[in-house]
């Protein structure tokens, strides 16, 4: 039995291997049968000592299994622990495990993952009434600064991930905070965000990653002074005064005639005539010298027409002034009479000011409008007003006073 139980330690320590109580009952090996008999019979606990080197890792916790869930316990010890019913675990002797650990130190290979039975306090030092979850919480450090703990029950961080940062999660960040997340192959946050440009970098630390960093260009800053340039593609009415206005069809003075083989076409500009000549193949293009005499005649005729028009306008203006002089005299007399009549009528219909009181302003000298009943109406209204009986005889007397 001793020879068969001396097996390599690493064959029974696996992360994903979990034994159940059913496998303990169903296994036909003499070792597991002895273990089941040991768990149920306390008198044979000492005879199972040599066989416990195989199943020592199955009972990961050296004390009683706690009914409370562990807050800080690692998942490896939970995965390796065997779900033994409480009746058999309560009768298990804790000294047998301690004896197995002291007698068989060479069976634990260095490559095997350590279990959680290496606690800070030995099994004999803790009382049976001490809660196991409080004991497990005691040796878990609050913050792991070095990346590997002294307690073998806590697994070291995987080498594929970087070591944790060297600052407290609630303390002020260190100088390497500004480039702690910058990787050489990523340009995602190489340039600061535009919305955060006003705040600057943390603690004034410059960005020193392995890639290029572009200068910070805050968008919230006022734009640079630009020259007053107006980029308008819509023609401004006052900007193109040098161009002549387009004339209507009946207003065109057609002085440029074609004359090619009896062609009667005439145009208002030489450019339009040359377009006609080119399109219709009516000879060579015309030159301004050909129409020099025609233009002189046209200008002279234009001047005569302009002079005649101005003379006609002047004559009409003088006639209007002569007629306006006689009418202005009559209008002046009418205006004086109407102004006097308006003044008298205005005095008759003039209303008193807002703060009018009897005797403060002289009454208007007019018989058509009487302003005297206004204060009497106020006095009678205030005297005869009774809230209890608004339809009483006093109100009727007030209306009868008029």
Swiss-Prot record:
<feature type="region of interest" description="Disordered">
    <location>
        <begin position="302"/>
        <end position="402"/>
    </location>
</feature>
<dbReference type="GO" id="GO:0005634">
    <property type="term" value="C:nucleus"/>
</dbReference>
<dbReference type="GO" id="GO:0008270">
    <property type="term" value="F:zinc ion binding"/>
</dbReference>
<feature type="compositionally biased region" description="Polar residues">
    <location>
        <begin position="392"/>
        <end position="402"/>
    </location>
</feature>
<dbReference type="GO" id="GO:0006355">
    <property type="term" value="P:regulation of DNA-templated transcription"/>
</dbReference>
<feature type="compositionally biased region" description="Polar residues">
    <location>
        <begin position="72"/>
        <end position="86"/>
    </location>
</feature>
<keyword id="KW-0863">Zinc-finger</keyword>
<dbReference type="InterPro" id="IPR039327">
    <property type="entry name" value="CON7-like"/>
</dbReference>
<feature type="compositionally biased region" description="Polar residues">
    <location>
        <begin position="99"/>
        <end position="116"/>
    </location>
</feature>
<feature type="compositionally biased region" description="Polar residues">
    <location>
        <begin position="19"/>
        <end position="49"/>
    </location>
</feature>
<dbReference type="InterPro" id="IPR013087">
    <property type="entry name" value="Znf_C2H2_type"/>
</dbReference>
<feature type="compositionally biased region" description="Polar residues">
    <location>
        <begin position="322"/>
        <end position="341"/>
    </location>
</feature>
<feature type="compositionally biased region" description="Polar residues">
    <location>
        <begin position="363"/>
        <end position="373"/>
    </location>
</feature>
<keyword id="KW-0175">Coiled coil</keyword>
<protein>
    <recommendedName>
        <fullName>C2H2 finger domain transcription factor CON7</fullName>
    </recommendedName>
</protein>
<keyword id="KW-0479">Metal-binding</keyword>
<feature type="compositionally biased region" description="Low complexity">
    <location>
        <begin position="87"/>
        <end position="98"/>
    </location>
</feature>
<keyword id="KW-0862">Zinc</keyword>
<keyword id="KW-0843">Virulence</keyword>
<keyword id="KW-0805">Transcription regulation</keyword>
<comment type="function">
    <text>Transcription factor that plays a central role in appressorium formation and pathogenicity. Required for the expression of a large set of genes including factors that might play a role in membrane metabolism and ergosterol biosynthesis, the chitin-binding protein CBP1,as well as CHS7 that is essential for normal pathogenic development.</text>
</comment>
<feature type="region of interest" description="Disordered">
    <location>
        <begin position="1"/>
        <end position="247"/>
    </location>
</feature>
<feature type="compositionally biased region" description="Basic and acidic residues">
    <location>
        <begin position="302"/>
        <end position="317"/>
    </location>
</feature>
<feature type="compositionally biased region" description="Polar residues">
    <location>
        <begin position="125"/>
        <end position="151"/>
    </location>
</feature>
<feature type="zinc finger region" description="C2H2-type">
    <location>
        <begin position="256"/>
        <end position="282"/>
    </location>
</feature>
<feature type="coiled-coil region">
    <location>
        <begin position="289"/>
        <end position="323"/>
    </location>
</feature>
<keyword id="KW-0804">Transcription</keyword>
<keyword id="KW-0539">Nucleus</keyword>
């Amino acid at each position: 039995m001793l020879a068969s139980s001396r097996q390599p330690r690493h064959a029974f320590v696996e992360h994903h291997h979990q034994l159940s109580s059913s496998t303990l009952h169903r296994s036909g090996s003499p070792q597991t049968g002895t273990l089941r008999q040991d768990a149920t019979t306390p008198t044979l606990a000492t005879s199972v000592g040599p066989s416990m080197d195989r199943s020592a890792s199955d009972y990961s916790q050296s004390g009683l299994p706690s009914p409370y869930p562990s807050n800080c316990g690692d998942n490896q010890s939970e995965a390796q622990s065997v779900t033994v019913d409480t009746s058999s675990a309560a009768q298990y002797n804790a000294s047998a495990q301690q004896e197995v650990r002291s007698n068989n130190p060479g069976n634990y290979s260095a490559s095997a993952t350590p279990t959680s039975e290496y606690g800070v306090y030995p099994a004999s030092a803790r009382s049976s009434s001490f809660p196991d979850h409080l004991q497990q919480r005691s040796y878990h450090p609050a913050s792991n600064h070095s990346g590997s703990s002294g307690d073998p029950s806590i697994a070291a961080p995987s080498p594929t991930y970087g070591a944790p940062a060297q600052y407290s999660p609630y303390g002020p960040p260190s100088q390497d905070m500004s480039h702690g997340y910058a990787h050489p192959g990523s340009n995602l946050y190489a340039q600061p965000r535009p919305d955060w440009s006003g705040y600057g970098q943390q603690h004034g630390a410059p960005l020193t990653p392995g890639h290029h960093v572009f200068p910070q260009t805050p968008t919230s800053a006022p734009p640079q002074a630009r020259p007053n340039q107006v980029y308008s593609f819509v023609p401004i009415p006052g900007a193109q005064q040098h161009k002549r206005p387009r004339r209507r069809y009946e207003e065109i003075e057609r002085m440029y005639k074609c004359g090619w083989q009896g062609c009667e076409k005439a145009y208002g500009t030489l450019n339009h005539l040359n377009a006609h000549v080119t399109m219709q193949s009516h000879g060579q293009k015309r030159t301004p010298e050909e129409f020099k005499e025609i233009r002189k005649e046209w200008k002279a005729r234009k001047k005569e027409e302009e002079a005649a028009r101005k003379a006609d306008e002047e004559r009409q203006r003088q006639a209007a002034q002569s007629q306006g002089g006689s009418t202005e005299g009559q209008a002046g007399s009418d205006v004086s009479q109407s102004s006097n009549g308006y003044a008298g009528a205005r005095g008759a219909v003039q209303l008193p000011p807002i703060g009018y009181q009897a005797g403060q302003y002289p009454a208007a000298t007019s018989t058509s409008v009487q302003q005297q009943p206004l204060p009497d109406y106020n006095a009678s209204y205030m005297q005869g007003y009774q809230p209890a009986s608004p339809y009483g005889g006093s109100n009727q007397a007030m209306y009868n006073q008029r």
